[in-house]
């Protein structure tokens, strides 16, 4: 509880205790700063929270009375009742209430709820700030405003829609797929994105192709002595035909059709090795080398990226620091609350005048005038649904603390994130990277029978001025979010000798290399945030929580940094696509964000919009808001009975070599494979096989399916336990291979089981090893294979 001041005072309420302590120091006497610790009330989280007089209402389970203008039922959270009493006590002796919650919709809503619960009889002001520094707090306390009720209505509409969506659609998942699943306005769309990417991977057919790289040597005209320099070059043409590269193949493993591939040659392994051997005959000398036929030199310029907004901070922290989105936001919250950075939930790339001046001053101070861009750089957003209500994320204040000055003040993770933000902010006002790029084409005739005309190209880049890379170079993010490498300049700074048309080069070696085209990369947290941002789905403040939710619900698992969908996710997305198509449509979800923004701006009526969403509407102007015939209510009524649960949970993979359909069935106890074998002489036989959790959807090929079907469902018998006499089996389960004892039918007990070590193989594990695994004593004495890979 905040310290009691003598006499009257101004009561300031913020959201966190850390902020309260910091701001109390800045405001001093005459103010009491205390914390609400987030929301003090919300919609009921369960039946136990619903007041007795509402429990029998048909809308009580959602907490929203859809028949009374979508009136929400707000209840004070049980763990906030003591806090409410404390705030009311402090308010008794206050002569003014200042609501200083976060500067966004959520913060505006928290302020409104405080007003509704505390019912102050003194003047009320809204205080807004984007950084916690003495200057920012003094400015905010001087320039207060009224509560923005349009923002409050927009947040309430968003909360009601999310509650109706989740509480009405989730029970359909429970009945049709399995219990304890959930649907959500943004989480279901994010899950669909991940599932669609996996579908693309499953349908992808790889193509194989070869190319070769030669090492060439030639005199360097830039050298006073014309010293011979060695450099790499790639084979690009044979007999006038361009050598195929990965970009020339489609997702079915075939060369793309069109002009671009009309004169393309797919080099196979034999051809590549033959050409490599022939090229090594071009050792130089009269007519025995490669002639330079063109030299193209161009200036190279690279501009810095914009300062961080929430999404790009999450992406860069993932790519450079290997932080999850959730971890990044937790650390950023600490930095903000302790006054080190500006507000971290923003979709703006704009710096304030103070931020620009501070960044430019430190560029001069640390790197010199030549590294400062001559004029102020301005950055405009090009992403759907950007609000740009706040400044970009930057170090706080009008003079930034250097990372070195905070090394002993911040924890290791906080220091790393602060340094990243500081570097990015300074880089945004620095000079461009300057350099040159050079492409050299060389032609010759390989000594084959018959002779083969060939062409090679060598490319290189020279950085003549590092510009912003001086501060933001190491591990420089490509910001694609696709994990293709962190250093944007790596592999490109190849030094080429100065050459001119007519010069010759000798081949010193030639190395063929085989390649296979790859399916689209799975989403990582960074690339998912990037894709959601580009589609206009969700808001900066929601990305981390959405990713956390789909992980917690079991819709995705992480393999390294990649997000892999579970088979349950496939079933859930399939159900949503069949019965609630618009609710997982990317454009519809993005349009909802626009409409919620319109409510925040006072351009759309909250009640009219909610009614169109839930009940449907005939008004053409509202059709974008309607998720289907009869609105959400109509969709639930149509689909609760009509959707076929078995069909929803049956995913056709492919037909086996005999033309028999193979399905993945999503069962209550996990996914499994199933096919029905028919014969002329016997009844159909249904074959089933567990799908181990370690097998991802795109790895479940025909070959893998046959391997799983071949594992006996009853397991392989290893023999009998020497002490109990019970049969011991080795079986393959969804969590991997394990051994199990078989109890007599009359024994009601639970059989002992034990997982195999990763170094063990279910096909070769012995009875002795199984007995030791099942032993209740430590089995550290168990002799294991030496290769533990």
Outline where the language-model segments fall.
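Metal- or metallocofactor-binding catalytic centers and their adjacent structured scaffolds
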Residues: 249-306, 500-503, 513
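Basic, low-complexity terminal or inter-domain segments flanking catalytic cores
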Residues: 2-3, 7-9, 21-22, 29, ...
């Amino acid at each position: 509880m905040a310290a009691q001041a003598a006499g009257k005072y101004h009561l300031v309420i913020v959201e966190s205790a850390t902020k309260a302590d910091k701001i109390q120091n800045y405001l001093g006497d005459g103010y009491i700063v205390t914390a609400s610790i987030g929301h003090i009330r919300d919609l009921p989280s369960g039946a136990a929270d619903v007041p007795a007089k509402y429990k029998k209402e048909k809308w009580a389970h959602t907490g929203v009375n859809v028949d009374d203008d979508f009136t929400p039922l707000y209840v004070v959270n049980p763990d906030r009742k003591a806090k409410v009493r404390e705030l009311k006590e402090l308010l008794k002796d206050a002569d003014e209430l200042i609501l200083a919650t976060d500067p966004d919709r959520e913060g505006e809503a928290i302020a409104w709820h405080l007003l509704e619960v505390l019912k102050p009889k003194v003047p009320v002001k809204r205080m807004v700030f984007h950084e916690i520094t003495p200057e920012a707090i003094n400015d905010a306390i001087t320039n207060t405003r009224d509560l923005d009720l349009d923002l409050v209505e927009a947040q309430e509409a968003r909360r009601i829609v999310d509650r109706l969506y989740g509480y009405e659609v989730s029970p359909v998942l429970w009945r049709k797929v399995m219990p304890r699943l959930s649907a959500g306005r943004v989480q279901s769309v994010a899950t669909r994105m991940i599932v669609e990417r996996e579908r693309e991977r499953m349908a992808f057919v790889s193509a194989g192709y070869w190319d070769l790289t030669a090492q060439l040597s030639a005199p360097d005209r830039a050298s006073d002595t014309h010293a011979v320099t060695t450099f790499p070059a790639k084979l690009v043409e044979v007999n006038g035909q361009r050598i195929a590269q990965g970009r020339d193949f489609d997702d079915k493993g075939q060369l793309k059709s069109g002009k671009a591939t009309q004169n393309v040659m797919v080099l196979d392994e034999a051809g590549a090795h033959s050409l490599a051997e022939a090229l090594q005959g071009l050792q130089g000398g009269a007519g025995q080398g490669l002639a330079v036929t063109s030299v193209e030199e161009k200036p190279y310029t690279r501009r810095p990226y914009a300062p961080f907004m929430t999404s790009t901070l999450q992406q860069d922290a993932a790519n450079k620091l290997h932080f999850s989105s959730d971890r990044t936001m937790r650390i950023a919250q600490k930095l903000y609350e302790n006054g080190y950075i500006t507000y971290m939930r923003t979709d703006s790339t704009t710096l304030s005048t103070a931020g620009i001046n501070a960044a430019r001053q430190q560029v001069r101070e640390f790197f010199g005038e030549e590294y400062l861009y001559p004029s102020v750089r301005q950055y405009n957003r090009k992403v759907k649904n950007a609000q740009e209500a706040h400044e970009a994320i930057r170090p706080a204040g009008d003079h930034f603390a250097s990372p070195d000055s905070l090394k002993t003040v911040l924890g290791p993770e906080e220091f790393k994130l602060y340094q990243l933000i500081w570097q990015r902010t300074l880089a945004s006002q620095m000079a461009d990277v300057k350099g040159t790029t050079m492409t050299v084409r060389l032609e010759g005739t390989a000594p084959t029978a018959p002779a083969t005309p060939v062409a090679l190209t060598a490319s290189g880049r020279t950085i003549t001025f590092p510009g912003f890379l001086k501060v933001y170079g190491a591990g420089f993010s490509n910001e694609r979010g696709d994990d293709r490498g962190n250093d944007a300049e790596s592999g490109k700074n190849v030094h080429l000798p100065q050459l001119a048309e007519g010069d010759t080069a000798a081949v010193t070696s030639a190395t063929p290399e085989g390649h296979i085209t790859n399916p689209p990369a799975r989403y990582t947290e960074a690339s998912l945030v990037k894709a959601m941002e580009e589609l206009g789905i969700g808001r900066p403040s929601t990305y981390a929580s959405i990713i956390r939710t789909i992980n917690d619900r079991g819709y995705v698992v992480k393999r390294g940094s990649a997000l892999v969908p579970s088979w349950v996710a496939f079933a859930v997305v399939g159900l949503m696509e069949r019965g609630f198509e618009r609710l997982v449509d990317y454009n519809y979800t993005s349009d909802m964000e626009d409409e919620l923004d319109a409510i925040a701006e006072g351009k759309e009526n909250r009640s009219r919009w909610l009614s169109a969403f839930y009940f449907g509407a005939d008004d053409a102007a509202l059709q974008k808001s309607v998720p289907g015939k009869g609105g959400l209510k109509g969709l639930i009524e149509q689909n609760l009975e009509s959707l076929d649960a078995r069909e929803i949970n049956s995913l056709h993979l492919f037909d086996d070599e005999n033309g028999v359909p193979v399905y993945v069935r999503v069962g209550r106890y996990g996914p499994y494979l199933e096919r029905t074998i028919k014969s002329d002489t016997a009844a159909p036989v249904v074959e089933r096989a567990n799908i181990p959790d370690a097998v991802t959807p795109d790895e479940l090929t025909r070959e893998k399916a046959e391997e799983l079907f071949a594992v006996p469902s009853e397991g392989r018998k290893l023999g009998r336990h020497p002490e109990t006499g019970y049969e011991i089996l080795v079986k393959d389960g969804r969590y991997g291979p394990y051994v199990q004892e078989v109890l007599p039918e009359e024994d009601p007990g639970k059989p002992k089981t034990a997982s195999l070590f990763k170094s063990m193989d279910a096909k070769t594990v012995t009875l002795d090893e199984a007995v030791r695994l099942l032993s209740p004593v430590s089995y550290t004495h168990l002799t294991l294979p030496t290769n533990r890979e």
